[in-house]
């Protein structure tokens, strides 16, 4: 079946089909991510597990790889300009309540926002220095950020 035929079969056409697919994939992504993080017992370990798990999941997503290869510009745009607010909102609604076991609500939301942006940025433009898919590398890179959230500097 051709793409055009598929688009015609889906009410709303191509854009509606792609939007439904994005929502489905985000739901699946957070379900996979949640499997291993609900029992973690510290703020730092929770956020490291989220970043490492998200990075690994993004890297192993076959459909995302195909989309990036076939239409890199529109795929990157859909992960940044178009969908970033929704991705951050979904990440916040999923991760922040788990982080609130360790820190206040505002800190949990700010940390989730920052780490979502970092994770997507490092996925789309990998660093030769930091590998957020590697637990040790992610921990070494992220711990200074966490200490700033948990122990904010006092201003005189």
What are the functions of these language-model segments?
Residues 89-101, 113, 118, 124-156:
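C-terminal peripheral helix-coil segments that are non-catalytic and often amphipathic
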Residues 20, 33-59, 112:
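Hydrophobic alpha-helical connector segments
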Residues 8-34, 48, 52, 69:
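An amphipathic alpha-helix adjacent to DNA-recognition modules
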Residues 36-40, 68-72, 123-130:
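Secondary-structure edge/capping motif, primarily at the C-terminal ends of alpha-helices
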């Amino acid at each position: 079946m051709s793409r055009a035929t598929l688009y015609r079969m889906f009410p709303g056409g191509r854009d509606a089909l792609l939007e439904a697919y994005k929502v489905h994939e985000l739901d699946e992504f957070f379900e996979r991510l949640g499997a291993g993080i609900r029992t973690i017992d510290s703020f730092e370990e929770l956020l490291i597990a989220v970043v490492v798990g998200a990075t690994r999941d993004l890297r192993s997503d076959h459909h995302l790889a195909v989309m990036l290869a076939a239409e890199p510009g529109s795929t990157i745009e859909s992960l940044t300009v178009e969908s970033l607010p929704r991705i951050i909102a979904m990440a916040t609604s999923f991760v922040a309540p788990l982080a609130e076991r360790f820190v206040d609500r505002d800190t949990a939301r700010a940390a989730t926002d920052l780490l979502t942006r970092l994770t997507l940025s490092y996925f789309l433009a990998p660093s030769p220095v930091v590998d957020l898919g590697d637990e040790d590398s992610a921990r070494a890179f992220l711990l200074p950020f966490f200490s700033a959230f948990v122990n904010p500097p006092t201003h005189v």
